[in-house]
Amino acid sequence: MKKILYTTALMLVAAVVLTSCGDHLDKKEMKQVERQSTVTYTINSSQDLIDAIDLVVTYKGKGGINVSDTISDTTWTKTVVNDMVPVKIGLSWSMFPKADSNISKDTLDLMATYIIECNEVTDKLNEWVDFIRLKDFPASKLGALCDLENHKQNCARTKGGRYETPCFIIAPEMIGDGLKYDWAQWRD
């Protein structure tokens, strides 16, 4: 029974969302913007994980439209170029365990990164975001739990105007008796 519930829990979606490129500009500034943003998404995972699960990634494609792709290799990369501002930038993934797969914390070896180039009025924003490997997630970094029914993704500007990016991931430490997975919010 525990294995069935554990497997079912892994079907939850681990969502990661950044922000909008240029969403803070007013209409006058929008006319002066070099209207281009480039995002390169990369997901690296272990062969053990690929063998144990079906991994489906959803990313914000051209125009901010959600595009889904199934990952079958240990490295997946996608570059999206937009000629509009603002544009939504985001990435999420879903894990679906394969039949008879033996999934442990060490199997959850996945790291997502993305590089953002957002051309705006004053300067060019180049931001590189690196999400930790799931299996290396320390209990000391565990932040506020999110309500699964009312889960909201958010981000906040730092003092320098850059975005502090919350990373919502599945935290193995939250399994407890093996019957429950929860969303966790991690910040460096």
At which residue positions do the language-model features occur?
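Bacterial N-terminal signal peptides that target proteins for export
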Residues: 1-9
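Core hydrophobic alpha-helical transmembrane segments of single-pass membrane proteins
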Residues: 10-14
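First exposed extracellular module after export/assembly in secreted or surface-exposed proteins
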Residues: 31-188
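Bacterial Sec-dependent N-terminal signal peptides
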Residues: 4, 15-40
